[in-house]
Regions:
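Structured alpha-helical bundle/scaffold domains in large eukaryotic membrane-trafficking regulators
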Residues: 61, 118, 122-129, 155, ...
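Long, amphipathic, charge-rich alpha-helical segments that form helical bundles/coiled-coils
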Residues: 79-83, 93-141
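Short amphipathic alpha-helical segments that mediate assembly, nucleic-acid/protein binding
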Residues: 11, 15, 35-36, 96-99, ...
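Short, charged, intrinsically disordered terminal tails
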Residues: 6-9, 22-24, 152-171
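Short, aromatic- and cysteine-enriched interfacial helices/patches
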Residues: 2-7, 68, 81, 170
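Alpha-helical segments in soluble extracytoplasmic regions
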Residues: 31-94, 132-158
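Short Lys/Arg-rich cationic patches that frequently serve as NLS/NoLS or arginine-rich RNA/DNA-binding motifs
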Residues: 1-29
Length: 171
């Protein structure tokens, strides 16, 4: 059945391709010397994704069907881990390194929170204690608020740096 092979699109946007080429999904090249810009883009996407992740966790708590939640939750888990792979490995600036570590921990938390919620929902019928654990789920919790603050801080720093660069070039 050689004639029936699937051909991959030339512009694949999988995490592996993005990480290997140092490009974002929009095709813009990441500057290795500007980890703050990369972290800002990653945090922006994570802020958008966390609303859907919150809905999946709340759906698991409400005992919505696994057939409905898993197709939504699985790609979220993969994308949160994929965003971690796109993170800069280290930052020279100690302040940026602190933000990088926080963002890495939050992305890991979000991926695991969705995965655990789906796993508990899948196994709930086995034990009453698992049902109590599902009842105790509280969305993404404090890390969701921390991600919002972290993104605001990254955006504010970037705006201040952009204005400083504009002023310096105008002089």
């Amino acid at each position: 059945m050689r004639g029936f092979r699937r051909h991959r699109p030339a512009q694949a946007t999988t995490v592996e391709h993005l990480a290997g080429t140092e490009r974002t999904s929009s095709g813009q090249a990441n500057s290795p010397s500007d980890p703050r810009a990369a972290m800002r883009r990653i945090a922006a996407e994570a802020v958008i994704l966390q609303d859907e992740a919150e809905a999946v966790v709340r759906g698991a708590q409400a005992r919505e069907g696994l057939g409905f939640l898993a197709p939504r939750g699985g790609p979220l888990v993969r994308r949160f881990f994929g965003l971690r792979d796109l993170m800069p490995k280290a930052c020279e600036d100690p302040g940026d390194e602190k933000l990088r570590r926080q963002l890495d921990a939050i992305l890991h938390h979000h991926a695991l929170a969705v995965w655990v919620a789906l796993d508990l929902l899948a196994c709930e019928w086995r034990s009453e204690k698992i049902g109590h654990q599902l009842d105790a789920l509280n969305g993404l919790g404090e890390p969701a608020a921390q991600l919002d603050q972290l993104y605001a801080e990254l955006a504010q720093r970037s705006s201040a740096d952009d204005w400083a660069a504009i002023r310096a070039s105008a002089s």
